[in-house]
Amino acid sequence: MMTENTKENITAVPEMKLELVPVPVSDVDRAKAFYVEKCGFKLEVDVQPTDTMRVVQFTPPGSACSIVFGTGMGDITAMQPGSVKGLHLVVGDIHEAREALIGRGVLVGEVEEHDQGVKYAAFSDPDGNIWTLQEMPWRSSEF
């Protein structure tokens, strides 16, 4: 028997915050250098609890969500390096963010403008994981 969803029988979902996104890489130290030195991400964790496991976690400037990569972490490190596409970094001024990354040695594509003034520019890490800078005019007050 199907039950109709009404406001009376739908349980509210509590607030959830995205905390950690795995990014598969082939060389942990090379990726660590890229994200810290080139992208300016904050190194949060770099631990090796066992001989076969290493966990490295970074947070983009101003973000509450971090990325993680390493070795010996089961399904996370079994992912194909370079297979993550379309991670978005929302910025207040895409031209400023793009120039800052270029100034640090990151190859960033040209800014493309789309509907409603949304702008995008993409770059990739050494393994080919693709990141997208995104500027949304209606969110400019957040920066």
Go through each PLM region and give its residues.
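Core segments of cupin and vicinal oxygen chelate
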Residues: V13-M16, V23-C65, G103
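Vicinal oxygen chelate
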Residues: M1-M16, L20, E44-V47, R54-V55, ...
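Short, charged/polar surface micro-motifs in flexible loops or helix N-caps
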Residues: P61-S66, G74, D93-E96
